[in-house]
Amino acid sequence: PFLKAYEFIKNEDIHDSQKTPPFVIIGSGLAAIEVSYALRKRWRNRRIKLFCHQKKINNKILKSLRNSHIELVDNLDFDYGKIILCTGNTSPLWVERKLLDFDSNGRFITNQNLKLKNCSGIFATGDCAVIESAKRPASGIFAVKVLNTLVKNLKKDIEGQSLKKWSPQRFGLQIVNLFPARNPMSFAIYNDFVFGPSFLIWFFKNRIDRNFIKQFHLKKGKMPKKG
């Protein structure tokens, strides 16, 4: 999916002109906001419109979006080009057919061991799941932090051992990069508080992101052979 999405964006590079119909991002969450900033950084001339509920977005961020020449709209009553949806996820149809427990946002309900409530042997984490006793919004922060517990519990489940419980923190610190006028900057969001934009926040996020990506780099000679 990522490669197809990346090719889709690359193919739009030739349309970086004010004469081209605007590119539209749909969504009011941080994903839609960060995608809008990233595309503005990539396309300096093309018109970009964010179709969103402005009341759901902090005023500091709204001002920054406008300063980055990202137009905020609440309808699509204009000629536009391509669209990207950043509207969150929903449960697939087979979930409803199997009568599995999920919340109003379409996320699987699990116990603290990360197992589905009424389906033995199946684990769920990340944006597709929520712990019944510790409900948190979908966020990459929780999705990353739960991984160690998930791996350990998969192993323990196979070996017939007692599973480990996981309790997410109450709030997660979220950092959003924005389109820089001169130096790169970011907002930091914690609960209802928004800090920045600041270069120091961007530096902090950049360091975290780079260290995270390094974990996925394979050393030379470690690539699996085809066939």
Outline where the language-model segments fall:
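Cofactor-binding loop segments of dinucleotide-utilizing enzymes, especially the Rossmann-like FAD-
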Residues: 28, 51-53, 127, 180
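Glycine-rich dinucleotide-binding loop and its adjacent helix/turn
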Residues: 1-41, 70-73
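C-terminal auxiliary extensions adjacent to catalytic cores
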Residues: 179-227
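Conserved Rossmann-like nucleotide-cofactor binding loop
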Residues: 31, 56, 90
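Rossmann-like dinucleotide-binding cores of NAD(P)H-dependent redox enzymes
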Residues: 22, 34-75
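A conserved FAD-binding loop/helix module that cradles the flavin
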Residues: 128-179
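FAD-site-proximal beta/loop scaffold in flavoenzymes
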Residues: 1-17, 78-145
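Active-site-lining helix/loop region of Rossmann-like oxidoreductase modules
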Residues: 60-63, 82-86, 221
